From Swiss-Prot:
Assembly and binders: Homodimer.
Binding site for substrate: Y116
Enzyme class: transferase
Name listed for the protein in its UniProt record: Glutathione S-transferase Y1
Any one biological process term the GO annotation gives: glutathione metabolic process
Reaction(s) this enzyme catalyzes, per UniProt: RX + glutathione = an S-substituted glutathione + a halide anion + H(+)
UniProtKB keywords: Cytoplasm, Transferase
GO molecular function: glutathione transferase activity
Species name: Cricetulus longicaudatus
Length: 218
């Protein structure tokens, strides 16, 4: 029986999950919920099911795999990654995976908070000034490695790819000073399963955010 991944009909928090499911050739189906237009932003599609799915902490995204029902995006990622030994093989690799996992969430949340802020246009110039330092830290952490944890693909690569790609969409030149990050994105997109998935109609690059956001909302 295929796994069921539930989320809004946007890229949001689930792009790394979708990419990991594709990379691992996992059998899954998507349950996509649609949010209504502003100002009401009707969420009844999700709210009508929210407490009927047997989730301990009902939220989106969720993953249902037989008797296993999981919420929280990173918990879902780790569940899939453990099945395929993608959490790092050595202690050093596992430490690097943990660091990037949490750093990527911080970096992602900073962009989310800006894009859902009513003062988006006013705050955007200051936010743009902070991007080079953010990207510099990722570049230095990656160094000359092909992947963030080392020589092999791990779950943190899916998170790093997604957040770096979002920032590049937000500020197209932000990775120009960091060729190793641009090479990393190209290397990731060149993975056979990933490349094939990105050519399908199922791949959702945008919108990144819901209709309530000030950027990438359609």
């Amino acid at each position: 029986m295929p796994m069921i991944l539930g989320y809004w009909n946007v890229r949001g928090l689930t792009n790394p999950i979708r990419l990991l499911l594709e990379y691992t050739d996992s059998s899954y189906e998507e349950k996509k919920y649609t949010m209504g237009d502003a100002p009401d932003s009707d969420r009844s599609q999700w709210l009508n099911e929210k407490f009927k799915l047997g989730l301990d902490f009902p939220n989106l995204p969720y993953l249902i795999d037989g008797s296993h029902k999981i919420t929280q995006s990173n918990a879902i990622l780790r569940y899939i990654a453990r099945k395929h030994n993608l959490c790092g093989e050595t202690e050093e690799e596992r430490i690097r995976v943990d660091i990037v996992e949490n750093q990527a969430m911080d970096t992602r949340m900073q962009l989310i908070m800006l894009c859902y802020n009513p003062d988006f246009e006013k705050q955007k110039p200051e936010f743009l000034k902070t991007i080079p330092e953010k990207m510099k830290m990722y570049s230095e952490f990656l160094g000359k490695r092909p992947w963030f944890a080392g020589d092999k693909v791990t779950l943190c690569g899916f998170l790093a790819y997604d957040v770096l790609d979002q920032y590049q969409m937000f500020e197209p030149k932000c990775l120009d000073p960091f060729p190793n990050l641009k090479d990393f994105l190209a290397r990731f997109e060149g993975l056979k399963k990933i490349s094939a998935y990105m050519k399908t109609s199922r791949f959702l690059r945008r919108p990144i955010f819901s209709k309530m956001a000030q950027w990438s909302n359609k």
